[in-house]
């Protein structure tokens, strides 16, 4: 197939995009049919290269700072034109997709990419509607040109790459970035700004539905288990990462999944394993000589990924949405071994732990975080993606929980019996047992034990889970060491929470010294 060197491929199929990616040398086929690509020196998001255009219509509503960095509007216009001109002189790919599955809340997006594989990624992760933009809404544009190199002195960027969101112009500019997760998270940030205006809570969470129509939400940062735990063969998946919660509905913002692949196994993650097939994109996964993926090989990164459409998941919500959640689960990966496998939260505790967003950076998705594992706090369990002040999202969460009567739980997928390096991590079957008990309603009205210092209430028994695991102090050989670790963790919580201006009731719902 011969093409002009500046040919534009518009809305071609996933199979054609795979073919083009191979033809252009962008990737190779794995034995399981997936397209395998490498993203170069950036194998995760680059928070220092993310900006929001500072302009009059939105600047008063954005929480400016290290996460939401301001970018001048005139510099944006100049850089957009420069990148567009560069891209128009080469082959590129255009697809028309939706971001948001609910009719009232979708955004129509024209997605232009310099590479076939990143267009395929967008096609698989966003929503391919049967009819594009039926409501005739104003269109957003993504311009993603991986082979454009920014010049900071000229362009006003931080490095050779950038991600810039312009709300007034409805544009997202991504230049010099081969890691495709930037595109997904940029549009998530856009919806995270827009949805609260409609009284909808945008959430960094996974969601699934039981046979009776009961919905569970799984909040958590990367590596805490959102994708793995929501991919449950006994339930129907809504989505693994980004959702909106409005009156009467939980809807997926996306149309696909972006699963971590490190140490992936068919035994522990059968749903994800089966979804890796022709049309799936594997980022930074190492292949052996027979082109079989070696998911245990982290020589490129711990943050290897699979991007696949929800159609590759057998049990899924056909409409990409469900009702309001019966159970809201905050997943935390506790490195200290202090937190119990499950705690039952009241509304004030829910607000406290939602604002805190405590977890560990495990196989981090961010560049520059290093290979080390460390504790962190990420407001709303996704601080890098929420442009408005945290209180906006916390108030919406409590409003929704109160209105529907959702039950809230804190689930530790991290360490027990000691901290990292001493204790051991909860295995996936144990955590699945906790989740199953929550979803069955077994913990509603359960008899609890109060844990001082960390100020949490734990059930005295959980069906299918060893009772001696429930109070973490019992799992430590040295009880004094546990008490000291608990005080250390409580201090981390208290120091982190000092920045929030909230009621005394919420402040007092957290750990106490």
Curated annotation (Swiss-Prot):
> GO CC terms for this protein?
cytosol
Q: Which cofactor does it need?
A: Mn(2+)
Cite the entry's keywords alphabetically. ATP-binding, Cytoplasm, Decarboxylase, Gluconeogenesis, Lyase, Manganese, Metal-binding, Nucleotide-binding
Tell me where in or outside the cell this protein is found.
Answer: Cytoplasm
* Superkingdom as given in the UniProt entry: Bacteria
Primary residence: cytoplasm
Q: Where does ATP bind?
A: 185, 204, 220-228, 269, 305, 431
Supply the Pfam families for this chain. PEPCK_ATP
Q: What is this protein called?
A: Phosphoenolpyruvate carboxykinase (ATP)
Native source species: Ectopseudomonas mendocina (strain ymp)
The gene for this chain is pckA
